[in-house]
Amino acid sequence: MKKTLTLLPAILLTTWLGCGGNQEATAPANTGVNGENAEKTKGIIAYTPQTLSNPFFSVIGDHIRAEAEKNGYEILIVDPDYDVKKQSDQIDDFIAKNVTAIVLVPCDRLSVGPAVQAANKAGIPVFTVDAKCAADGVKIEGHVGTDNFQGGELAGKAMIDALGEKGGKVLILDLKRAHSCVLRVDGFKKVINAHNKEAEGKIEVVSELDGNGDRTKGYQSTADALQAHEDLDAIFAINDPSALGAYTAVKEAKREAKIKIIGFDGQLDGKQAIKDGKIYADPIQHPDKMGKQIVQLVVKYQAGESFEPETLIPATLYTKAEADQDPELK
C-alpha cells in the first residue's frame, strides 16, 4: 500500500485540559482540517470521545492519529466533554465535512443514536472504541474495546483479596450511561455474588452512586457515602479519575488506613497511586492498542476487506507488585 504520510502531516490544534482535582491532562481538541490538503490524502478520520480531560481518551486519540497518518489519512479530533448534545452536533459537523469515517466513544449509549443514524444515512461508516452505542436502528461497522466484563471480574477478585476473610461493605462509583462501565460493574458483581455463596465473611454492596468518571464527582459521591456509611470498608470505582477523587474524600475523612479502593484503567497517575498505596489495584486497559486497531478496521473497511465486527482486548490486573517494578513510575 502506498503511503502518503510524507506528503502531508495532519493539521492539529491542541487544547490542554485538566480533569478535576489537581490532575492535568494533555489532549488534542478541535483538530483543524484543510479542505485542499484533505484532497491529497485518503480522507479524514474523525474522532469524538466522551471527553479529552480523561487521559485515557487522549491516549486513544494519540494512537488514532499516529495510525491514521501512517496510513495516509488526516485526523479530526474534537471534545464533547461528556455533553451528549455537543457530541451529536459534532457528528453533524463531521457529516457536513464529508469525513471518511467516524470513530465514536458515546457520551450516552442511547441518546447519541439519532446522530449515528444521520451518519448512516449520509453513507459515512461509524466505528466505536471503548464504549458501544446501544441505540436501536443504528449501524456500527466495527468496535474495539476492553473486555470490560472480564475486567470487572478482575476487580471483584482484587476486592476479595483486599478485604480478606472478614469481607466488608462496599461503595460502587459507576457511570451507567456508558455501556463499558455497566459491564465492569456487572463483572464485579458476578464475582462478588459467587464469593458470597461460599464465604463466611460476606461482601455487601451498600451503595451505588454516580461517579461521572471524573475526580470531582468521584470525590463528591464518596464524601456523601462516607457520611451515610460510617462502617464503609472499600470502594470500587469504574475508572482512575473517579477512584482518585474517592481517595481525596477518604483522606479528608481520615479513613484512608481502613478503606481500600479498586480502580480501573491503569492510567499513569492511577498506577502511581497504586505504588503510593492510595489505590489497591487496577484492572488495566490498553488504549494504545485500541487507537491503533480501530484505525486498522477503518483501513480494512475502505479497502473492502473483511474483519471481525468486535475486537475485545483482555484487561490485566495491576497491583503494587507490578507498580514497584514499573520503570515509568517515580
Question: Where in the sequence are the language-model features?
Answer:
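Positively charged n-region of N-terminal signal peptides that target proteins for export
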Residues: M1-T4
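A residue-level marker of the well-folded mature domains of exported/periplasmic proteins
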Residues: L17-K330
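Bacterial N-terminal signal peptides
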Residues: L8-W16
